[in-house]
Amino acid sequence: MYAPIRSPITELNESTPSSIPVATSYATCSASFAKLVALLVDDMAGLSIVLSEIYIYFKLLFLIVITESIQNKLEDIVKEYKKRGIDLGIITNVDEVSLFFDTSQYAEAIKKKVIEIVRQSGTGRAKIDFKTNGYVIKFAIQRGYYNRNTIEKLKSLVDYLHEQKIRCGYEIKGDLIFVMSLTDFLQKISEDVKEKLKDERVKIASKQEYTKYIVVIKVEQ
């Protein structure tokens, strides 16, 4: 890519006789010195460019190696959560790795269960609004579509989800509201990521993409 860097001394020797007469004038010495300085400046500029390229190359190489290290550790987390029925994924860029998981399937499964409970209660077909606010997902069951049997079944569902470390509950304010919070779910994965990458020099942040219910845990170097 680059021509060999020629030493300024080599350049000077090639263009200067092997022995300089004693009578060499001051002007000749000054010219030789000026040429030496010019060669030094040129070579240092070239060396600077080469060093810059080497720095960039090693920086990119370093980032790629570290990214692979981080990615391998994140893949371990993906496998662990896969066993629990939770799908995670990894997005890799040159300078960052993002771990993401899709909460829609997780929330939709619970939504279907709530609908099933309400329909089985014998009170007719329930209309359930699926809303999000931060990490809180609400299922609003309209008035007249729930009874004691419905509430008992929802209590059982809430108890089951609590056993799965999912914070949720219900409240009755005219309509019956079933509330599920994914905050703890996200926090648990974030803690696992931090623990797994504790030996890496990374910054970890998380955010939620509200449009697709995608939660992203970003790992930056």
Curated annotation (Swiss-Prot):
Q: So which stretches are on the Cytoplasmic side? A: 67-221
Give TM regions: 46-66
The superkingdom listed in its UniProt entry is Viruses
Per the UniProt topology annotation, the Extracellular ranges are 1-45
Location(s), subcellular: Host membrane
A GO CC term attached to the entry: membrane
Q: What is this protein called?
A: Uncharacterized protein ORF221
Give yes or no: UniProt keyword Kinase. Answer: no
**How does the entry describe its membrane topology?**
Single-pass membrane protein
Is Metal-binding included in the keywords of this UniProt record? no
